[in-house]
């Protein structure tokens, strides 16, 4: 199992091939910045500070994301990637902040996948953000870079609202699951061509995928008492699931409570600071209070034919994916028994 120090970092940067060259287009293409901060060193103004410096260097960072925001669910990842590709982003900047300091990694965005691991990346580390930015600026000064980014916004674009369905939101469970199989979307393994990796990176990739396998085994364990037909599959688009005759797929979303409820089609009360989640306990139901700003998990079922979303009879979000999955499955089974 991965150690806490490994889990805390952006896993993509550990699998990149680091070179002495900056990605092509750093001052001419659009850039997305991906940030990860460990809680003990979190700075709410980090993106603003970073953007001011990148703009001064002629880097057009048109989008800022937090790493766990990108991986906020299978559909969230897919739709976020599609939105970035639609905006013709070519360069990725990863900023990792930990108690050990700052790491800045520049890479190339992929097409089918988030990162193009075949392309060379550039990385710098330091004790402060100013230190790594100065070293980036000095590197850029040694190169004859084509500058064409003249309309860079003054402030970073942080907010992104992903709509998780295109049809109707139903606050119930699809009773058709008593007859049709439920496709449960598994956590995805990470695939990188082994020829691109060194021994240490191959070990890291193996360790990462072992942890994914444990999580997927846990999903199947939670569903061990599910009385209807269920199949555990790698996630696909709705169209791909539908083509393979799967009408209903179970997925999750991981976001701050307010964003989560909006993405899933719930009515939002702007004055509400907390949400009440219904969770099963010993055959009964109890209530749990969740902070509106804290990130939580919520499972839901999507109908692949038309984009309808079934959120369940209860708002059953929870702090861990295991608890959220158990909540949704158990409450759905209880409802089907009535």
Predicted regions and their residues:
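Short beta-strand and adjacent turn/loop elements
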Residues: 11-338
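Bacterial Sec-dependent N-terminal signal peptides
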Residues: 1-14
